[in-house]
């Protein structure tokens, strides 16, 4: 046997110790990893999926995501749904849950401010000033249910500010959440939609189609708040996720999708 390949008893013991230490570290990471159940407003689906992936890579914790309207999640949580963290599309829902003793006091914070966009999947469907709304050259305009989804409320406020709500009311088609409103437009069931900018915006530009970013003064600010729910109290993964949302990586993702952190 070549002398260069011979391991002494001392060398072998040292290798085993190093291997045991490495395995121990791996076991420790796995042992400390946990899951967090997160209720996510539909408008935040795409950025949250990216954030959750980075969160798992960086911490070992896994975020199990459910998407829907803030109003629907409020009802589910009030009825005992075991979510640990809520990322709402408004500030009111987390505040109401805190008042109902279903959220941890002091854990609520604004994680993003959303923007509304008038969008068409057609390249020339929407002009730069949104004049297509006044022209009326469309059959259906998709919006989210304003009673359940803050982006739906912002859509109605925008139409009201433009003096178009009454004239366009018969053309509105409502989705239960902003995700369903997007599907109406993407499937061709509605030519236009007042949607969350994040649904059609990536890396500083529209991913497809055409759109008009609605001026912020036409509706109340879409302030989106996160809160630690009662089921997440003292849960390491839940606490880690809320901290992660305030970090540079998460904020960078939000900006790429058109949010104002």
Feature annotation, model-predicted:
Residues 1-15:
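N-terminal secretory signal peptides that target proteins for export/translocation
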Residues 2-5, 25-26, 32:
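Generic short amphipathic/hydrophobic targeting helices enriched at N-termini
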Residues 7-10, 30-31, 214:
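N-terminal non-cleavable signal-anchor helices
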Residues 11, 17-29:
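Bacterial N-terminal signal peptides
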Residues 16-17, 190:
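Residue-level micro-sites within transmembrane alpha helices that shape
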Residues 33-81, 88-91, 95-261:
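Exported/periplasmic ABC-transporter solute-binding proteins
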């Amino acid at each position: 046997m070549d002398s260069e390949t011979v391991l002494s008893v001392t060398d072998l013991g040292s290798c085993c110790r190093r291997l045991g230490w490495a395995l121990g570290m791996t076991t420790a990471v796995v042992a400390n990893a946990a899951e967090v159940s997160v209720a996510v407003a539909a408008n935040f689906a795409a950025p949250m999926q990216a954030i959750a992936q980075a969160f798992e890579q960086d911490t070992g914790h896994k975020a199990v995501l459910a998407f829907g309207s803030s109003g629907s999640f409020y009802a589910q949580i009030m009825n005992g749904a075991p979510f640990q963290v809520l990322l709402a599309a408004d500030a009111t829902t987390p505040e109401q849950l805190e008042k109902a003793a279903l959220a941890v006091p002091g854990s609520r914070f604004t994680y993003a401010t959303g923007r509304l966009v008038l969008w068409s999947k057609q390249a020339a469907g929407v002009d730069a000033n949104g004049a297509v709304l006044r022209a009326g050259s469309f059959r259906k305009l998709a919006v989210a249910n304003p009673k359940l989804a803050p982006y739906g409320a912002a859509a109605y406020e925008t139409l009201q500010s433009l003096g178009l709500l009454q004239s366009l009311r018969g053309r509105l088609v409502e989705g239960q959440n902003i995700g369903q409103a997007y599907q109406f437009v993407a499937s061709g069931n509605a030519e236009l939609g007042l949607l969350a900018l994040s649904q059609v915006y990536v890396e500083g530009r529209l991913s497809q189609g055409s759109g008009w970013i609605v001026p912020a003064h036409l509706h109340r600010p879409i302030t989106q708040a996160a809160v630690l729910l009662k089921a997440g109290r003292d849960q390491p993964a839940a606490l880690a996720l809320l901290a992660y949302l305030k970090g540079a990586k998460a904020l960078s993702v939000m900006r790429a999708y058109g949010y104002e952190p």
